[in-house]
Amino acid sequence: MTLNSVAARTPDGRGLFDNLTLAFGRERTAVVGRNGVGKTTLLRLVAGLAEPAEGSVTRAGTVGWLAQAQTPTDDETVADTLGVAGPLAILHRVLAGEGSLDDMAEADWTLEERMQAALAEVGLADLALDRRTADLSGGEQTRLRLAGLKLAAPDLLVLDEPTNHLDAEAGAMIADVVAEWPGGVVLVSHDRALLRRVDRIVELSSLGARVHGGGWDLYVERRDAERAAAERDLEQAERAIGRVQRETQMAQERQARRDRAGKAARANSSDPKILLDAQAQRAEESGARGQRLAERKRQAVEADLTQARERVERVRQLALAMPATGLPAGRLVLNLNEAVVTVEDDRRLLGPISLRLTGPERVAVVGPNGAGKTTLLKLIAGLVEPSAGNVERPVRAALLDQQAAMLKPDETLVEAWLRLNPQGTPNAARAALARFLFRNVQADRRVGELSGGERLRAALACVMTGAQPPQLLVLDEPTNHLDIESIEAVEAALSGYDGALVVVSHDADFIQNLRVDRTIVLKSGQLQPSTTP
């Protein structure tokens, strides 16, 4: 698979990348970059699902595609999704003695065995083939499509965020499939555990693509070294511009003194006028040459400074500072006492659960999909009330989910801030949003226009910069739709948060980097015995 001088555009004509040349073989390649840079578009070009605006794509062999979000049709069955409905019907006709000669020739006698093996490998061993795909959870649908790819065995596997919405067990299964795939793999993911299993990383930006050999940890080591070098270059450039400015000022002062001295000497000299004029012209030309040299030097140093600032600003622009909450150590933040949550038909979703948190404790909640983690977070944040038991929450709490649902798509950021902080003023809203990097006209953007990372940043701004920042922050899969740079910025911001924290995330690196104090395990709505509340 080769991309030759490829360019890509958005539907409205905005350029994503130009003159991109890449080759993909049997190695495992991850594509990383900021949201909106064109990672999914690149994958679609590789998979043959899109055509480049310029350049060409050369393919040899078969390609399998696993999209980030695929909606099954209403009548689509498990067999349809696996891609075996037709071959399976042929096999069943032959086995029932109803097959034609063509059926006999086409029958795949190992199909059922291979199909069951593929389903078992992705944790769906007992799945009925006639079951509707739409009835499966999102994670189960991803597993099912992966089983279909294992059956098809393409030469090149193309995966777009394959671990999104999967629990830790399913994410580990995806990583194993990637590591063991006999052909080539090209993937986009913000799952750093998965990125550690690849052979190389392609860093995509508006400037093109840079290829880094090795997995995620080696890439980060090189990237951090480059960032440190950029900071050093900026410091040197700032010192150089200061030095040039001082030298220029001193040279101008010396020239001014020489000019004054020359004028005084000319006025008092008895030399012929033609000689004095020649001396004045030589002095003027010498001064002009010095000024031109100084100007060229100043321009060169300013160019170095601009370049150094741009390199550093790309990193610094995501830096966030969380305001202090003033939560005292040891203060009671939350006490759940035999709390139960049920739905209208009295079906129990959660509990009974007892859990006690004190400030500024950090707790991670883990468990399989469907265990009740989101319900528990809503109970902790006060968004649902217990059907039985008691909840004590003596501090202000706020819940941020992966969609930042507290924000309305049609409102501007200033409007959102004022709605969530009704005692504030428009000037206070703009100042607060600026702290979270929404400056000037950025504060007038509508929520619906924001990327996932921007939306989470806006939600943090609205929640954390009011008169009373929450002393208990509850996070439900906050990194699901973020690029890695945004995830790292959120990690850095939350590391400086001095309140209590409860987080659900399938991102083990995110949990580790938040330095949680303990992890509680939830399964079928119950805290597991290994949990110490």
List the model feature ranges, each with a label.
Residues 1-10, 87-142, 222-343:
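Coupling and communication elements adjacent to P-loop NTPase active sites across diverse families
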Residues 146, 174, 460, 479:
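Hydrophobic anchor residue at the start of the ABC signature
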Residues 168-176, 480-492, 509:
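Conserved D-loop/post-Walker B switch-helix segment of ABC ATPase nucleotide-binding domains
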Residues 157-161, 166, 400, 472-477, ...:
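Catalytic Walker B motif of ABC-type/P-loop ATPase nucleotide-binding domains
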Residues 72-138, 401-472, 477:
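ABC-family P-loop ATPase nucleotide-binding domains
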Residues 4-6, 15-27, 55, 336-342, ...:
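Conserved beta-strand
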Residues 75-80, 207-232, 522-533:
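Conserved beta-strand-loop-alpha-helix hinge in the C-terminal portion
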Residues 25-29, 40-102, 200-203, 359-371, ...:
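ABC ATPase nucleotide-binding domain signature region
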